[in-house]
């Protein structure tokens, strides 16, 4: 039998336990105070960053909804923000309280619910990005299918599938984790994972890495490559332009149309690189240390870099809203207007503020479709 210690969000929920002492006082006093302070500071920073950034983007989208300017891409950006807010509220915040008290303070039902919701947030954040990329692929490569399936609905099929998979794939957490005695009759309870076989922990960590990181990353990269090839093929005449790409695109027939497609292609290439690179950079360190801890009995579990990297499961939730807001001119213009509205509520200042707000308003008037 294998018991997994669970004193951080997902990392230690899946990692081998540190040796426990015989008494409850010894169990509670084993942590490095400086490392605990670093953990709390890191989790607090991540929580504020995730909540603030996603809240701002949701506020910008809400302004567009009130004005009747809701576009299909905004559906996915909105649900991605909701998924990332779930990460902040159900993963980072409980983990912050958990690290502050060392042991999980709550009944068994709360332990299972927290571990379940922590995993739901991880899955939903990754799968919403994948759903958004799949929808962009369908809209560009097979536009008729996109219209037929109602891509502009606020609850469309990819969004529902992403949430459904997140809820279903997180169910094992309800059965793996429970309030258990952390020592041999010590009387100290913590929210720990239990695996009947020694290989259970390794199998579970590997499965999570594949389903949360590897599979979505490959899907996102593949869709973005196909989107780029479709846009590129529309600029190249000839029967071979669809070979190896996707179907349903259209060819531009005028120089101005070609210029617009060239600009769209350049934007798509930039967005592809940013999405894939940021996604990999945010998730790779976390899952590398997870797999290392699961497969290597000699892993430095108590080292400060190791412990802090294990807390970065939600790092991608900090970057998601800004990536898509940056590449959506309508959302970025709404954010400018939102900032200007907040500044206009402050005491009057110099003229440049008014000029910047007017500029933001002009951006908003020009772009209402993206």
Curated annotation (Swiss-Prot):
Disordered: region residues: 1-26
Subcellular location: Cell membrane
Pfam families listed in its UniProt record: 7tm_1
Keywords for the protein's UniProt record, in alphabetical order: Cell membrane, G-protein coupled receptor, Glycoprotein, Lipoprotein, Membrane, Palmitate, Receptor, Transducer, Transmembrane, Transmembrane helix
Keyword presence, Metal-binding: no
GO molecular function: vasopressin receptor activity
GO BP terms in the entry: cellular response to hormone stimulus; G protein-coupled receptor signaling pathway; positive regulation of gene expression; positive regulation of vasoconstriction; regulation of systemic arterial blood pressure by vasopressin
Keyword Cell membrane: yes
Any one cellular-component term (Gene Ontology): plasma membrane
Cytoplasmic side: 63-76, 135-158, 220-270, 328-370
Signal peptide positions on this chain: none
Extracellular membrane side: 1-37, 98-112, 180-199, 293-307
Location, primary (coarse class): membrane
Polar residues bias spans: 1-10
Residues carrying covalently attached carbohydrate according to the record: 22
Membrane topology, from the record: Multi-pass membrane protein
Top-level lineage group: Eukaryota
Function noted in UniProt: Receptor for arginine vasopressin. The activity of this receptor is mediated by G proteins which activate adenylate cyclase. Involved in renal water reabsorption.
Binding partners and assembly: Interacts with ARRDC4. Identified in a complex containing at least ARRDC4, V2R and HGS. Interacts with TMEM147.
UniProt similarity note: Belongs to the G-protein coupled receptor 1 family. Vasopressin/oxytocin receptor subfamily.
Name under which the protein is recorded: Vasopressin V2 receptor
Organism, scientific name: Canis lupus familiaris
């Amino acid at each position: 039998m294998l018991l997994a210690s669970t004193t951080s969000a997902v990392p230690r929920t899946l990692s081998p336990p540190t040796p426990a002492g015989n008494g409850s006082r010894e169990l509670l006093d084993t942590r490095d105070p400086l490392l605990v302070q670093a953990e709390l500071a890191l989790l607090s920073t991540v929580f504020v960053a995730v909540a603030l950034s996603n809240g701002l983007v949701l506020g910008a989208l809400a302004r567009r909804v009130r004005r009747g300017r809701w576009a299909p891409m905004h559906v996915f950006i909105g649900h991605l923000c909701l998924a990332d807010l779930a990460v902040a509220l159900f993963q980072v915040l409980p983990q912050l309280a958990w690290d502050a008290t060392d042991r999980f303070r709550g009944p068994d039902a709360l332990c299972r619910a927290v571990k379940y919701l922590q995993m739901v947030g991880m899955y939903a954040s990754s799968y919403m990005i994948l759903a958004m990329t799949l929808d962009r692929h369908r809209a560009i490569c097979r536009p008729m299918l996109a219209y037929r399936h109602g891509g502009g609905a606020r609850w469309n099929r990819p969004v529902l599938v992403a949430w459904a998979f997140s809820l279903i794939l997180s169910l094992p957490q309800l059965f793996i984790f429970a309030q258990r005695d952390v020592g041999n009759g010590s009387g100290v309870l913590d929210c720990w994972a239990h695996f009947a076989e020694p290989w259970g922990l390794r199998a579970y960590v590997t499965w999570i890495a594949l389903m949360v990181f590897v599979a979505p990353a490959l899907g996102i990269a593949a869709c973005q490559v196909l989107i780029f090839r479709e846009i590129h093929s529309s600029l190249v005449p000839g029967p071979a332009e669809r070979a190896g790409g996707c179907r349903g695109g259209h060819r531009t027939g005028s120089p101005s149309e070609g210029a617009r497609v060239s600009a769209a292609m350049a934007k798509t290439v930039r967005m592809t690189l940013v999405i894939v690179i940021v996604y990999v950079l945010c998730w790779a360190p976390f899952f590398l240390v997870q797999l290392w801890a699961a497969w290597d009995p000699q892993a430095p579990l108590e080292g400060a870099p190791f412990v802090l990297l294990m807390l970065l499961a939600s790092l991608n939730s900090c970057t998601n809203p800004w990536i898509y807001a940056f590449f959506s001119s309508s959302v970025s213009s709404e954010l400018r207007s939102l900032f200007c509205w907040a500044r206009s509520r402050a005491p009057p200042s110099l003229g440049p503020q008014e000029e910047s707000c007017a500029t933001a308003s002009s951006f908003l008037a020009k772009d209402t479709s993206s």
